[in-house]
Amino acid sequence: MSNESCLPYYTAHSYSSMSAFKTSMGDLQRQLYNRGEYNIFKYAPMFESNFIQINKKGEVIDVHNRVRMVTVGIVCTSPILPLPDVMVLAQPTKICEQHVRWGRFAKGRGRRPVKTLELTRLLPLKFVKISIHDHEKQQLRLKLATGRTFYLQLCPSSDTREDLFCYWEKLVYLLRPPVESYCSTPTLLSGDAPPEDNKSLVAAELHREGDQSETGLYKPCDVSAATSSAYAGGEGIQHASHGTASAASPSTSTPGAAEGGAARTAGGMAVAGTATGPRTDVAIAGAAMSPATGAMSIATTKSAGPGQVTTALAGAAIKNPGENESSKSMAGAANISSEGISLALVGAASTSLEGTSTSMAGAASLSQDSSLSAAFAGSITTSKCAAERTEGPAVGPLISTLQSEGYMSERDGSQKVSQPSAEVWNENKERREKKDRHPSRKSSHHRKAGESHRRRAGDKNQKASSHRSASGHKNTRDDKKEKGYSNVRGKRHGSSRKSSTHSSTKKESRTTQELGKNQSASSTGALQKKASKISSFLRSLRATPGSKTRVTSHDREVDIVAKMVEKQNIEAKVEKAQGGQELEMISGTMTSEKTEMIVFETKSI
């Protein structure tokens, strides 16, 4: 009786899901059945072949001038699993290698050489990705969860089938079904698919969940737990990590296939998931609540019927605010139907920080019923400004504070300093400098006219007293310069050169005297006109003690008056909409206000 008929539970011939397992027992399976240390592999169907290890270029890796032979076996450890779940690797033992020469002589005598294998790796297929590296050279590529990659080339014996690599290709296709896009959820087929194919693909995708990426990053605790016999037997994984609890159950073909839940009391987290219907309806719901993180809820529902696909997704996240913390809330919903292809999305966001709140709302709709329509609406509301929050409780809205900044009060003449931009400040400075030049020119003109008038009066006095005290005026250099012409004109009994000089200076003094009289008359008229204008301006101007300064002495008086030349103002309106929200509307014009300092100086003549 063969070994195949001795299998009491089930054999590879009774495994109807895959034809690759309908083969005779190999060396590894026979060894595990006869004297294996793992009872779980004793009655499990296995598909095995011999490979040699190569590199990526296809070159054979030689270790000590010998080829490394590897036996790869794909095992299904439980009859309730639709697909195999474990990959085993074995290699010849050292004792077997030492007796290779003896095996050659034994083979010549008609006896088969004894070949002993030892298991070196036991890997769940969840953490191994098998792919075809080279079809012509019959090479496979193994990508482990740790990131390591191995390349194997099929090395069949002489008595094996020629199409052995075709079975490996079919097995790789079953373990890695081609899907449109990889996702973390199981692949759901339409209702027209056969029940067996639907079952196989869904289970394969469940086993391949999280292993679609090339990086293959997994936690060490997951890898260690998955290598246990409980996982290999299809009983699932139950482990605790970082104070969390999770549970999973294998999927079956009956309605209400799987129900799982996880809860964590310390963090206030609860997760629940259900799968109903003939592998077409899935519902997942989760919630996490904590005083620090708030609450979060996500729900997903997908149902497939004849000619109709419906998907709904809703989520919400809330963060509880503290004294100086902000709070945000968002909500969204989406609905897709194959009949009319409609989509709806609603979202809201709110932020509150010490009296400042912002809210937004949007909606979009898309429908395909021989027409296309879309709509969106949004609003932003701001209640307070940052300046009012720093200074104290707010009295008015944001625009009211802007209205009171940047202009001078007409009552007290004081100017409230704001913080304008650099460009506006430079323009204002240039205007002030330009306007400050004109009063300085006028005051210098008045001072020059007064000095010339006093000089002419002094010249007249000096002319009258030049005959009496001509020698007394020769003590200082300044008096000589100012009174030179009068002294020369007073010497009537000099030389011929002096007489000619006397005549020329006499004429010049007469002309200058006449011009001085004309200029003095015109200057007095201009001064009278300007004095009348200044008096009218002073009457119209509201002078305050803080803006006017007077310096008096026995012979002069100085007045400093501040005049408003420009004004800056911003007008705004604040209206309340429905719901108590304040809406700000800015209207009016904006002008600038500046002041100019005018200096009046009066001296006694």
UniProtKB/Swiss-Prot annotation:
Belongs to the GARIN family. The modification Phosphoserine is found at S592. Residues 475-484 have a biased composition (Basic and acidic residues). This is Golgi-associated RAB2 interactor protein 3. Residues 239-265 have a biased composition (Low complexity). A motif (Bipartite nuclear localization signal) lies at residues 441-458. It is found in: Golgi apparatus; Nucleus, Cajal body. GO terms for biological process: acrosome assembly; binding of sperm to zona pellucida; cell morphogenesis; flagellated sperm motility; penetration of zona pellucida. Interacts (via N-terminus) with RAB2B (in GTP-bound form). Interacts with FRG1. InterPro entries: GARIL-like_Rab2B-bd (IPR022168). GO terms for cellular component: Cajal body; Golgi apparatus; nucleus; sperm head. Expressed in adult spermatocytes and spermatids (at protein level). May be involved in RNA biogenesis. The keyword Nucleus applies. Residues 434-457, 489-500 have a biased composition (Basic residues). Residues 234-265, 407-529 are annotated as: Disordered. Residues 463-473, 513-526 have a biased composition (Polar residues). The keyword Phosphoprotein applies. Keywords: Golgi apparatus, Nucleus, Phosphoprotein. Pfam families: GARIL_Rab2_bd.
